[in-house]
């Protein structure tokens, strides 16, 4: 298919917005991820595994709805900054407000941490997203960068918790859980760190990259952080309820034989 014709079709559906191509692809990839997780989880009987599937399926499901809304221009507003009109997709922040706590919940379930720790993580995470949105909707550069800094500090706090408290808790659950947790945490550390960098160089910040490239990069980050995360998690034995069961020792076998 001619890519120019494909882009023209997306432009028509998206009221001439060039970024609609990437929003459409993002919608499709999120839907594929949701469907894959649903099919993979169908018939799973392990209680713990079903809990992980329930949480993880919601992540790309919510994201696909957000991307579809942005594709059709819903969740889009204009903000004037320094006399220049900027297109701001606040639907993206709505997506993150729901999906990032779910990703953290998956990690918290792996580590088996208490409710207070989970509540703290989710609360700081929500503050990170809300302050980022306030920054995106602010009309002065100083306000935008101040809120960006506030949001980034919140992100650092969340990542610190993951790399310290939760990592230690996951390590106590055995090598299978620790390995999966470390892999997922490394993925989160890399990808989540890229978000504020893209924000600051994108149209919401310094404007080094245009809205089309910015949308493409956010789409790649979102798909990897949601579908990629879920793919790694749900293929691991760490989600099964018997991961903590100790193997019988040789001495126990002898005693049983007696």
UniProtKB/Swiss-Prot annotation:
CDD domains: 7tm_bacteriorhodopsin (cd15244). SMART domains: Bac_rhodopsin. Residues 41-49, 112-114, 171-173, 244-258 are cytoplasmic. Keywords: Cell membrane, Chromophore, Hydrogen ion transport, Ion transport, Membrane, Photoreceptor protein, Pyrrolidone carboxylic acid, Receptor, Retinal protein, Sensory transduction, Transmembrane, Transmembrane helix, Transport. One of its GO terms (cellular component) is plasma membrane. It is found in: Cell membrane. Belongs to the archaeal/bacterial/fungal opsin family. Light-driven proton pump. This is Archaerhodopsin-3. It comes from Halorubrum sodomense. The lineage of its organism: Archaea, Methanobacteriati, Methanobacteriota, Stenosarchaea group, Halobacteria.
């Amino acid at each position: 298919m001619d890519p120019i014709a494909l882009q023209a079709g997306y432009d028509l559906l998206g009221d001439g917005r060039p970024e609609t191509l990437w929003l459409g692809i993002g919608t499709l990839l999120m839907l594929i991820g949701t469907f894959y997780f649903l099919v993979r989880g169908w018939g799973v009987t392990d209680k713990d595994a079903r809990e992980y599937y329930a949480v993880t399926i919601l992540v790309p499901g919510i994201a696909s709805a957000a991307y579809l809304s942005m594709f059709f221009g819903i969740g889009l507003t204009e903000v004037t900054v320094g006399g220049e009109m900027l297109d701001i997709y606040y639907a993206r922040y709505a997506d993150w407000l729901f999906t990032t706590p779910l990703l953290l919940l998956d990690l918290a379930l792996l580590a088996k941490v208490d409710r207070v720790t989970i509540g703290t993580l989710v609360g700081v995470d929500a503050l990170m997203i809300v302050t980022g949105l306030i920054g995106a909707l602010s009309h002065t550069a100083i306000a935008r960068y101040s809120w960006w800094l506030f949001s980034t500090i919140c992100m650092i706090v969340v990542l610190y918790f993951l790399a310290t408290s939760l990592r230690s808790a996951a390590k106590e659950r055995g090598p299978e859980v620790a390995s999966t947790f470390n892999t997922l945490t490394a993925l989160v550390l890399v990808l989540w760190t890229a978000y504020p960098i893209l924000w600051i160089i994108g149209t919401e910040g310094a404007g080094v990259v245009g809205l089309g490239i910015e949308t493409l990069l956010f789409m790649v980050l979102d798909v990897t952080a949601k579908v990629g995360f879920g793919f790694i998690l749900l293929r691991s034995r760490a989600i099964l309820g018997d991961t903590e069961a100790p193997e019988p020792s040789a001495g126990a076998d002898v005693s049983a034989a007696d």
